[in-house]
């Protein structure tokens, strides 16, 4: 909010907080996250990132996770990949079941963006990421697998922060009647997040604008 206001007026984050308090505005609470861990069902990769969520160029470090949404028709699952260079969501898939086919569709999108790069792809120890099929996709495309330690959300906080923003800004406090309505909202938000939502860590630019400027 602070950076959005700075587009038209000079203001700092403390004043924004005071104005929100005066107006009675509060941040929305987070709900319990989807847990994909089902024990060790396959190979557990080393933690290559060790909470270093910084990158010096696109396609150097990626992170992924799955989160759950609900509407009147049932549950919907989002599986995205985030580039840690500019926080851009470079690939994602929405499905009504968090299955291997969802991960495969997401990876197909991500691989199309590699352009010869060999990134690290970091995740938790969810069963999807332990599957030999997933690990084969990474290996065949020169992607290094990295996994968080079990039961510590701080080791994938970069993706958790995106989920928190998404749900706070377009999901919490709203009722969705159909899958179609919820899917449309998520598609539109991810486009907005990538192309328009400015971030302090990106010098007040959106992820796509930051990447574009860095490559010029």
Swiss-Prot record:
Q: Does the keyword DNA-binding apply?
A: yes
What's the domain of life for this entry? Bacteria
What are the alphabetically sorted keywords of the record? Answer: DNA recombination, DNA-binding, Transposable element, Transposition
Q: Select a single GO molecular function from the record's annotations and give it.
A: DNA binding
Keyword Ribonucleoprotein present in the record's keywords: the answer is: no
> Does the entry annotate any disulfide bonds, and if so which pairs?
none
Task: Please provide the Gene Ontology terms (biological process) for this protein.
Answer: DNA integration; DNA recombination; transposition
Q: Where is the Integrase catalytic domain?
A: 54-215
Family per UniProt?
A: Belongs to the transposase IS3/IS150/IS904 family.
Q: What name does UniProt use for this protein?
A: Uncharacterized transposase-like protein HI_1721
Q: Which organism is it from?
A: Haemophilus influenzae (strain ATCC 51907 / DSM 11121 / KW20 / Rd)
């Amino acid at each position: 909010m602070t950076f959005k206001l700075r587009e038209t007026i000079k203001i700092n984050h403390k004043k924004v907080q005071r104005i929100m308090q005066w107006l009675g505005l509060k941040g929305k609470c987070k709900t319990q996250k989807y847990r994909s861990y089902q024990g060790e069902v396959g190979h557990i990769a080393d933690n290559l990132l060790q909470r270093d969520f910084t990158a010096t160029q696109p396609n150097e470090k990626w992170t992924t996770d799955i989160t759950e949404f609900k509407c009147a028709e049932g549950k919907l699952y989002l599986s995205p990949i985030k580039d840690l260079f500019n926080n851009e969501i470079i690939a994602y898939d929405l499905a009504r079941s968090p299955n291997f086919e969802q991960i495969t569709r997401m990876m197909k999108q991500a691989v199309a963006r590699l352009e010869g790069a060999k990134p690290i792809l970091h995740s938790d120890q969810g069963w999807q990421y332990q599957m030999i099929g997933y690990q084969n996709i990474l290996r065949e495309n020169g992607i290094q697998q990295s996994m968080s330690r079990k039961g510590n959300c701080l080791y994938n906080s970069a993706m958790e922060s995106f989920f928190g923003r998404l749900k706070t800004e377009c999901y919490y406090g709203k009722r969705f009647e159909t899958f179609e309505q919820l899917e449309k909202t998520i598609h539109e938000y991810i486009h907005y997040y990538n192309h328009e939502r400015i971030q302090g860590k990106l010098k007040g630019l959106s992820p796509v604008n930051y990447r574009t400027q860095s490559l010029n």
